[in-house]
Amino acid sequence: MSARLEVEILTLFPRMCEGYLAESILGKAREAGIVSVSVSDVREHARGKHRVADDAPYGGGAGMVMKPEPLTEAIEAARARLPGALVALTSPRGARLDQALARRLATHGRLVLVCGRYEGVDERVLAAVDMEVSIGDFVLTGGELAALCVVDAAARLVPGVLGNEASAGAESFAGEDTLLEYPQYTRPPDFRGMKVPEVLLSGDHRRIERWRRREALRVTRERRPDLLERARLTENDLRLIDAGDDEL
């Protein structure tokens, strides 16, 4: 069976990625052949005895810039290995990663993720990429964490990766209404005086579903009201927002 999602990560520090990719859901998906993720060292395309992949910026300034030759050649080699792949550079200037973008990337099926480093990459490298991706308005040491976020978010949407296919649809930002997920509970039913809501122990699946929907609405209103404004709410949702447990 060929993998449903094929990814190659281009980085100066392969070991930063390999540990995460071998564990948990991603590790199992790779073992099962559902997702294929390889990590390639950009330095393999660098010149000289010391395989230098960065240099001082023209015009002066702090830090180093990733050189265009090794990075562009690494991208070209990855494209040859994954024909038709979408090449994305991790960059604070990029499109913000959200569930919609993760779904788009998962659907594409083949991705090459280029990890930025230092003060950034030589601007001429952008001629070899299709898009830039950001995971938020903050600064990281390098793009490896961002690339892993992209892989994780996209892989979860690939059929067969999650043990329960309903899991992805119930999570925060899943589906079209963009609500945060409802609170989750497990055993024991009473922990230091904090009890699991009675409705979840009732066995009444209709009431449980209504409770979960109400709680998703409540949590979203309290913590991300901007999402609630964009959500596709029904008349029943509007009634549920302020409903008590006895009204479920």
Curated annotation (Swiss-Prot):
GO terms for cellular component: cytosol. GO terms for biological process: tRNA N1-guanine methylation. It catalyses: guanosine(37) in tRNA + S-adenosyl-L-methionine = N(1)-methylguanosine(37) in tRNA + S-adenosyl-L-homocysteine + H(+). SUPFAM superfamilies: alpha/beta knot. One of its GO terms (molecular function) is tRNA (guanine(37)-N1)-methyltransferase activity. Transmembrane segments: none annotated. Pfam families: tRNA_m1G_MT (PF01746). Keywords: Cytoplasm, Methyltransferase, S-adenosyl-L-methionine, Transferase, tRNA processing. Its EC number is 2.1.1.228. Its main location: cytoplasm. It comes from the Bacteria. It is found in: Cytoplasm. S-adenosyl-L-methionine binds at residues 116, 135-140. Signal peptide: none annotated. Specifically methylates guanosine-37 in various tRNAs. Homodimer. Belongs to the RNA methyltransferase TrmD family. This is tRNA (guanine-N(1)-)-methyltransferase. The lineage of its organism: Bacteria, Pseudomonadati, Myxococcota, Myxococcia, Myxococcales.
